[in-house]
């Protein structure tokens, strides 16, 4: 149906652009704090762990946690705030969950770029009387611009191609990935689904072309290799405290989301009866719900795909580097 398809395209682009921007900003925040700000050992380690959690966890865990915490029967909305008609499904639910899922990608990309910026350039600007904000906007940011574009591109593509999160928390908010799936399973229209998939591919290729053309016209060149000297970390409280507070808020929210799932699995009935804690759901998963078979199949597929992926990545990277 053309109206549904065009609506799904619009929804997908809206979510993709917002998630790309938010993920890039949060990733830049965590990367900047790690590279430039002097942090305590515990705080710095906590931020590193939090920024890597979404990478190693299943993609739908945050969606499930969002529903369990902020849904109509959520702990925070219903039992703490006494809000009984709150709905997390739709545009904002997808955007929040995807942002928390994909910002670690931006963090890892931007952290490497920040470490490769020569500190002598920034210190020279400081010696000439520039403020830290002026140094960031006139020296650091121009050098980061290609990396920011790449980070936005990657998260945008991952957002519009994401299926698990919109399927769980999207509700009636259609995206291209879920529309393609429903076109196959619901309408039994494989040709139509293939056409939609081509459109999705064209969108990602168009974004890549625009980003590449835009960045290639920039005159700023990113620095690669080792910095000429060590970087003096920021100890000024006027800079350190606000950045630490922002990172702490994101970190606490992510930790709360991940704690919710294992604890919620021990509740007798979610949303109504929380005590006494029970392990019956784990027993049912592996006895009645074919959980052991699903676990075995997933483990076997991982063992098969991991070495193949590693081998192909090594071959492709070798050819790309050696052909230059």
Residue ranges and their predicted role:
Residues 68, 162-187, 271-275:
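Glycine-rich helix-loop "coupling/hinge" segments at transmembrane-helix boundaries
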Residues 104, 123-124, 134:
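Internal catalytic domains of large membrane-associated glycosyltransferases
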Residues 113-114, 138, 166-169, 182-183, ...:
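Short alpha-helical segment immediately N-terminal to, or the first helix within
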Residues 1, 277-286:
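A short amphipathic helical element positioned immediately N-terminal to and/or at the very start
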Residues 1-115, 143-163, 193-212, 239-269, ...:
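Membrane-water interface segments at the C-terminal ends of transmembrane alpha-helices
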Residues 128-129, 142:
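Glycine/proline-centered hinge or cleavage motifs at structural transition points of membrane proteins
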Residues 121, 130-132, 163, 190:
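Membrane-helix interface/capping residues of multi-pass secondary transporters
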Residues 209-246:
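Alpha-helical transmembrane segments of integral membrane proteins
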């Amino acid at each position: 149906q053309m109206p549904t398809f065009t609506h799904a395209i619009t929804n997908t682009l809206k979510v993709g652009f917002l998630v790309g921007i938010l993920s890039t900003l949060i990733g830049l925040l965590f990367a900047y704090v790690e590279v430039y700000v002097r942090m305590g050992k515990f705080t710095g380690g906590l931020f590193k762990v939090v920024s890597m959690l979404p990478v190693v966890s299943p993609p739908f865990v945050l969606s499930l946690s969002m529903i369990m915490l902020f849904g109509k029967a959520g702990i925070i909305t219903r039992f703490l705030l006494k809000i009984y008609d709150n709905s997390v499904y739709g545009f904002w639910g997808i955007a929040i969950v995807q942002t928390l899922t994909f910002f670690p990608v931006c963090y890892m990309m931007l952290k490497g770029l920040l470490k490769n910026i020569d500190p002598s350039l920034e210190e020279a600007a400081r010696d000439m009387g520039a403020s830290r904000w002026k140094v960031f906007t006139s020296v650091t940011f121009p050098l980061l611009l290609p990396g920011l574009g790449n980070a936005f591109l990657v998260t945008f593509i991952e957002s519009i191609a994401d299926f698990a999160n919109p399927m769980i928390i999207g509700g009636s908010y259609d995206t291209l990935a879920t529309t393609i799936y429903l076109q196959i399973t619901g309408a039994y229209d494989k040709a139509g689904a293939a056409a939609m998939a081509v459109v999705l591919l064209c969108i990602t290729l168009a974004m890549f072309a625009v980003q590449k053309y835009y960045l290639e016209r920039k005159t700023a060149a990113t620095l690669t290799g080792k910095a000429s000297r060590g970087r003096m970390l920021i100890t000024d409280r006027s800079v350190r405290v606000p950045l630490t507070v922002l990172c702490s808020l994101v970190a606490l929210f992510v930790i709360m989301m991940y704690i919710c799932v294992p604890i919620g699995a021990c509740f007798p009935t979610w949303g109504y009866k929380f005590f006494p804690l029970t392990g019956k759901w784990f027993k049912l998963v592996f006895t009645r719900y074919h959980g052991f078979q699903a676990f075995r199949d997933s483990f076997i597929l991982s063992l098969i795909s991991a070495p193949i992926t590693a081998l192909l990545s090594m071959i492709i990277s070798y050819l790309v580097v050696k052909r230059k």
